[in-house]
């Protein structure tokens, strides 16, 4: 029986890793040993930052809402508390979008919330 060296399998694996490492600096885009370490680390960063992105966007929405609410004489925490009392159930993403793109609609929401202070 002849010896099977799995040449095609390892070549395809190398090709896959080097394709993922395309655009990396130095030997990281051409040398398999270096590329596999860099690709593995890049995938770890990608996994971590998919979670961090959710935190970052929530913080951005809060900053935008806070800036818009302060022009109406409230602060963020008061505004969110009065929204809950008023029974207005709009999430932060939509509120931030309204604050940036539809200031009239946001102003009407703030006035409804102010009625429940």
Curated annotation (Swiss-Prot):
CDD domains: Ribosomal_L20 (cd07026). Pfam families: Ribosomal_L20 (PF00453). It comes from the Bacteria. Keywords: Ribonucleoprotein, Ribosomal protein, RNA-binding, rRNA-binding. GO terms for cellular component: ribonucleoprotein complex; ribosome. GO terms for biological process: ribosomal large subunit assembly; translation. Disulfide bonds: none annotated. One of its GO terms (molecular function) is structural constituent of ribosome. NCBIfam families: rplT_bact. Binds directly to 23S ribosomal RNA and is necessary for the in vitro assembly process of the 50S ribosomal subunit. It is not involved in the protein synthesizing functions of that subunit. Belongs to the bacterial ribosomal protein bL20 family. This is Large ribosomal subunit protein bL20. It comes from Rickettsia canadensis (strain McKiel). The lineage of its organism: Bacteria, Pseudomonadati, Pseudomonadota, Alphaproteobacteria, Rickettsiales. The gene is rplT.
